[in-house]
Amino acid sequence: LAKFILGNAIRDKAAQSPVARRVLWGLDLVFVGLLLGVFRVLPVAWASALGARLGRVFGRILKRRNRHVRANLSLALPDRSPAEIDALAGDVWANAGAVLAEYPNLYRIADPRREHLEIEIVERIPAYDAPDRPVVFVAAHMANWEIPAAAIARLGFRPRLMYAPLANPWLDRLILYYRA
């Protein structure tokens, strides 16, 4: 997430003023907290679909950020047409929205009594025979990057994760709460 969500236009002033920074952090916390609260009361599939829809909308509204996403996609995929890049940018924003909407539902997604998470082991994992021994799992960020840790835990391993904390420490604590 950005340093500020709602106050990005005045981030330079906020960088100079601890009071302004805290006010913007608080506004961001309230905004994201309300969104996550709505997503938490919805069924998982609905929350994810709504998050994807909102992600697409916000992607169009956040023009400067969308230009940045499009520029990165153009660099990574130089053979794609501008129309294809636009479509991919929309997909990037939809995925980001879906991931955000799934945060307050991670406990339901990971719950083995529900059918949200299917684990399929294609080849034998030698470390599976000794889950108390250290092993490194690597997962691609194809959709919700929090789900592989839940799958690993369901296999009997105790995952330890690395992440970069958010610039807003209050928002960071909220996201960590949902990750736990």
Regions found by a protein language model. Name each.
Residues 2-139, 172-178:
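Membrane-anchoring hydrophobic helices of lipid-metabolizing enzymes
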Residues 98, 131-180:
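Catalytic core of membrane glycerolipid acyltransferases/transacylases, capturing the structured
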